[in-house]
Curated annotation (Swiss-Prot):
Belongs to the Mediator complex subunit 19 family. Residues 183-195 have a biased composition (Polar residues). Its main location: nucleus. This is Mediator of RNA polymerase II transcription subunit 19. Residues 171-206 are annotated as: Disordered. It holds the Pfam family Rox3. GO terms for biological process: regulation of transcription by RNA polymerase II.
Amino acid sequence: MATSHEDGSATHPNYYYYVDPSLPVYESQQPNPVDDLITIYGLEEVARQVARTNADGTKAVKLRKSYKNQIQDLSGRFITIPSRENGKGGEISDVIFQNNPDMMNQAKLVEGMSEEEYRDAMMKRDTGLFEPPQMDWDMCSTVIGQLMKSHPSEFKNSGFDVDDLAFDLNGTGTKTKKRKYKSNGSSMASPNTELQPDDMKRRRLE
């Protein structure tokens, strides 16, 4: 059935102002973006673990979990094992042993060297980190052997000094003296002044 205007100048089909019935029927998107997608996909527990606030409105104590923390509950381990191939191996040795790469025995793959020879050279370079003069095992044994469960005041009586565990960053073997600060009467301390109790109180008030 057609619909015509009052002037009769034009005639249009019934669906002119609506939807063409010959076209496919429109289907709404599923699931609807305005629906509760967390409930639909069963993510309530995950959402609770990463929520910034608790259900009662209080601030959550734990930090939001990263992807690595999320998968810790799964069986198996998903941690990359450090190795030379992935570039994650040997990064901490320079920190622990204070080795300058230029002073370490270098193992280079030269022409004519077999794969086994190169592997042996790399092994010798790594084991050299734990041999004298890189490591003083006698000193380590003495210091670590004194770390027994006891009152802190007993450490010095047994010959233990906490400075023995410190790194000799300047390579001189001497202790660095800390600069003392003296108060000049102001609430702000200069490098040549020492903080007094009154100064600390002023800083707290400020």
